[in-house]
């Protein structure tokens, strides 16, 4: 699926969600990510990036609804600078994502859970200020689960925290030793999102 197909799906599904009930909401959000790749041997939430996008939400009742979005997200992993030789190393993965989530509102808080599909738009390695190709390369898609919560700050503005994890390996593990271990079967993106946004 190409990026144009993702955009088409978003534009096609948004009116359908809105048709579920006459009233629907749209919004935008921007923020930062911190991420790691499970199974890459680097460890730690040391890779920082940016994220942002738009969404539409359709209420099913006064407290329940669905939300679909279209987001850009930086993912990957990074080692801290070595204190002896000062080497650095990071995987830099860039995705366009379409999360589809169920939402439940309780006062100023709204809780979200669902699935996402991500399409890779670029990947590389940054080591000691030089870029290299990733080998073996990551798959050009990412499918996983996402959950989070939103705190409404007045009528229009909100802050949001979100966690996502791949459920299908983003690439086979380079060091697959235990066939009975789920996490040794491959690498999995894990991302924390910290966002501010506005409803329209």
Walk through the language-model features, giving the residues of each.
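Residues that define the transmembrane beta-barrel architecture of outer-membrane proteins
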Residues: 22-24, 44-50, 92-96, 107, ...
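Bacterial Sec-dependent N-terminal signal peptides
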Residues: 1-29, 149, 196-200
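Predominantly the C-terminal beta-signal and adjacent terminal strand-loop region
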Residues: 78-79, 136-137, 145-147, 154-200
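Outer-membrane beta-barrel translocator domains and adjoining extracellular loop/strand segments
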Residues: 38-43, 78-85, 123-130, 171-177
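Structural signature of outer-membrane beta-barrel domains
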Residues: 33-37, 73-77, 118-122, 164-169
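Repeated loop/turn-to-beta-strand initiation elements of outer-membrane beta-barrel proteins
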Residues: 63-66, 108-111, 155-159
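Short glycine/proline- and aromatic-enriched beta-strand/turn motifs that initiate or cap beta-hairpins
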Residues: 21-57, 129, 191, 197-200
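Residues on the lipid-exposed face of transmembrane beta-strands in outer-membrane beta-barrel proteins
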Residues: 28-32, 50-58, 70-72, 98-104, ...
């Amino acid at each position: 699926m190409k990026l144009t197909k993702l955009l088409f799906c978003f534009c096609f599904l948004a009116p359908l969600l809105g048709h579920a009930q006459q009233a629907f909401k749209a919004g935008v959000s921007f923020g930062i990510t911190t991420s790691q790749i499970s199974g890459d041997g680097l460890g730690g939430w040391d890779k920082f990036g940016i994220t942002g996008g738009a969404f539409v939400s359709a209420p099913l009742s006064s407290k329940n609804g669905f939300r679909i979005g279209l987001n850009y997200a930086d993912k990957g992993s990074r080692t801290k600078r070595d204190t002896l030789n000062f080497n650095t190393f990071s995987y830099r993965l860039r995705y366009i994502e379409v999360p589809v989530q169920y939402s439940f509102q309780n006062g100023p808080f709204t809780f979200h859970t669902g699935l996402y599909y991500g399409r890779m738009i670029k990947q590389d390695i940054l080591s000691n200020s030089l870029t290299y190709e990733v080998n073996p390369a990551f798959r050009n898609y990412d499918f996983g689960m996402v959950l989070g919560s939103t705190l409404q700050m007045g009528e229009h503005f909100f802050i949001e925290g979100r966690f996502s994890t791949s459920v299908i390996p983003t690439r086979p593990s380079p060091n697959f030793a235990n066939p009975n271990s789920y996490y040794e079967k491959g690498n999995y993106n894990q991302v924390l999102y910290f966002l501010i946004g506005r409803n329209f």
